[in-house]
């Protein structure tokens, strides 16, 4: 087979990146739009905790994909990917007209439409973890790095939309003689949340079109069954075997214990993972619990006391730190377990300070000062950026273990996210451990 031209390779990398962009764009878009929608939805400051639980429950999508593989073994990933993309496009498109629709349940008003559609999108995004990567596992490692770059874009592009939308500003009216101020005056955003969800739908349509373009450029991928097809396109790519061997060596047992051809998906294949690989899986689960469950649940409590501007910037810049960490990992990849552990400890220290701010809400340190606002925004960006780098580096190292390692990595991510979200739901939504701060009211005055 003739070597592909440079133009074809560049186009393939672009399509792979756009394909990866659609993996978590829907949920990331909802997170960065929270500063806007939280003003109109009855859940208020508890909404991030609700969303964390819904995203964790989206792990049911993994069960659906597993059932598909049992009922249709060897059929490949094309149909599940198309279903995932269809759910993402339709769910996001329905958010545009329905996100403000409210329903009375048990005597209380809830944003049932918004939460239900978020759950559908969570199902699709969680299922993408176990459908997209197996489809691309037959490609050489450079294409997989383009895919991870695309996953970074799934956070960056919604952030760009949010920045273009503008920060929700408000003006506090002068306090009258009796000392009771009137309601705050909100300034409208440049465009509505409905328009934001419409633009997000367009991004998901582009991602789905990129997948169809991949099927046209790489027709051999469609006919290769999922089971036992680990070699795929790798054999014809110069230098790929050497690179994969280099990436696999930190995680695999000695060659005498891993002498098989391609890893099989049965449980015995997990013996390919070494003790170091198990430590990496634990690190991946821990960072996922913090970034996908614990920290998002308290982001509003830690940043909103410093103002809506601080909250919006913390959400947007925190999400934008993800693709920046991906860029860094593409150039500088930490392969040391001690180094990754040290970075995780640094991120944990940042997260502990942010958790302390949430506990001390509505009167955390430096509230009402520019220094406090800058500090909380910078710490959110650094904390999520450090954890994102650790997750990317850990996943890259685990990729060397083959399909069993990728499966274990996906399970670790989802289990960690679930545990983090479930842990934070009672203190935020049931016991009300964290206290919110009302606009234009200063509860910190002596």
Swiss-Prot record:
Plasma membrane transporter mediating the uptake by cells of the water soluble vitamin B2/riboflavin that plays a key role in biochemical oxidation-reduction reactions of the carbohydrate, lipid, and amino acid metabolism. May also act as a receptor for 4-hydroxybutyrate. InterPro entries: Riboflavin_transptr. Residues 254-263 have a biased composition (Polar residues). Coiled coil: none annotated. Residues 229-238 have a biased composition (Gly residues). Glycans are attached at residue 129. It is a multi-pass membrane protein. GO terms for biological process: riboflavin transport. This is Solute carrier family 52, riboflavin transporter, member 2. GO terms for cellular component: plasma membrane. It is found in: Cell membrane. The chain crosses the membrane at residues 14-34, 47-67, 79-99, 104-124, 147-167, 196-216, 278-298, 313-333, 340-360, 367-387, 405-425. GO terms for molecular function: 4-hydroxybutyrate receptor activity; riboflavin transmembrane transporter activity; virus receptor activity. Belongs to the riboflavin transporter family. The keyword tRNA processing does not apply. Signal peptide: none annotated. Keywords: Cell membrane, Glycoprotein, Host cell receptor for virus entry, Membrane, Receptor, Transmembrane, Transmembrane helix, Transport. Pfam families: SLC52_ribofla_tr. The keyword Transmembrane applies. Residues 228-267 are annotated as: Disordered. Riboflavin transport is Na(+)-independent but moderately pH-sensitive. Activity is strongly inhibited by riboflavin analogs, such as lumiflavin. Weakly inhibited by flavin adenine dinucleotide (FAD) and flavin mononucleotide (FMN). It comes from the Eukaryota. It catalyses: riboflavin(in) = riboflavin(out).
